[in-house]
Amino acid sequence: ERLRAGDVLDDAGQPLGPDAPHRVRQRVWYWRALPSEPRVPFEAELLFRDDELLVVDKPHFLPMTPKGRYLHETLLVRLKRQLGLDTLVPIHRLDRETAGVVLFSLRPASRQAYQAMFRDRQVEKVYEAIAPWRDDLVLPREHLSRLEEDPQTFMQMRPVPGEPNSRTHIALMERHGDWARYELRPVTGRRHQLRAHLNELGIPIAGDRIYPTLWPEPPPDAEPDYRQPLALLARAIAFTDPVTGQTRAFESRRTLAWPAQSQDAAG
């Protein structure tokens, strides 16, 4: 039944049917039933589709792929069922808490070419974030640091001595009371890079449940709290299409709201 429903995947994220051939040492992924899986009350928006690519505007709080307590309430599973695209695979990823533009591959034959764009840093990515305003912070600036996983928390990335392995261009877009909107252009793609870099500068992103300190983990049966989304948006992405040779540019239609206290202060 699970095989027929497409709930068993191979390592590439492709569904294995009942008649799929067996390969030695093949790993498969089983989509288990989650009776208590919470419904994520936000929808993705389709921005573009051709024979090779699907471009989606992801909402906050929706995981990219099955993990933990989320299976059906993930962007990949929703899109596969909505569009009937069994070959759909994400080319890159956004954190569950982050909203914005994300690309999916439709055809296995061209997938590697698109993945190589990200590996070889041939993609221009632009993010927006809302974080505290610091009048002593010189902007624009290029921030470099060496980020490694914190062995105490495992969830956080922390700066350590050594050769930098992460780089982000940071610019001020506008100020709003005690808050500011920043434009972030990552050159590298370390885990939590943008969140960790702004935290290093003393301006952690509004609504961040990981930086500077971990928020308490809610009980497993607790209702999700959607009142404070992470104020981080993957606003735009641009690249030369490796298959067609065309210049591609896509932009999110979402916006980030100012934190309530900033609005109160401005009023």
Language-model-derived ranges and their functions:
Residues 1-267:
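RNA pseudouridine synthases
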